Amino acid sequence: MATAKPTFEEQLAQLQQIVNHLEQGNVPLEEALQQFQEGIKLSKELQTKLTNAEKTLGHLIDDNGDEKVYEKQTDDPSNNGGGNRGFGSADEQ
């Protein structure tokens, strides 16, 4: 019988526990390495879940039932926002 996969929130809580434990500084080296590796694994799994959720939310349906694809906003300095102010900008009034 397969066990249920932990939820995003459960994995995040587990990662937070690992970080808190390692930050205490009194963890034996072998245990610290094992926990660090587990933390990296959890971090990658959480990032994958976030990426998948972002892709899912990137496809929204408008009022007419048509799919609208929204591009991910980045911190890219080459996109200074000129003419592309995004949802809720003052230009939409």
Swiss-Prot record:
Reaction catalysis annotation: Exonucleolytic cleavage in either 5'- to 3'- or 3'- to 5'-direction to yield nucleoside 5'-phosphates
GO BP terms, alphabetized: DNA catabolic process
Domain of life: Bacteria
Cell compartments where the protein resides: Cytoplasm
This enzyme's EC code(s): 3.1.11.6
Key word Cytoplasm present: yes
GO CC terms, sorted: cytosol; exodeoxyribonuclease VII complex
Region (Disordered): 61-93
Major localisation: cytoplasm
Keyword Mitochondrion: no
Quaternary structure and interacting proteins, as annotated: Heterooligomer composed of large and small subunits.
Family per similarity comment: Belongs to the XseB family.
Function summary: Bidirectionally degrades single-stranded DNA into large acid-insoluble oligonucleotides, which are then degraded further into small acid-soluble oligonucleotides.
Protein name listed in UniProt: Exodeoxyribonuclease 7 small subunit
Naturally occurring in which organism (per UniProt): Limosilactobacillus reuteri (strain DSM 20016)
Lineage: Bacteria, Bacillati, Bacillota, Bacilli, Lactobacillales
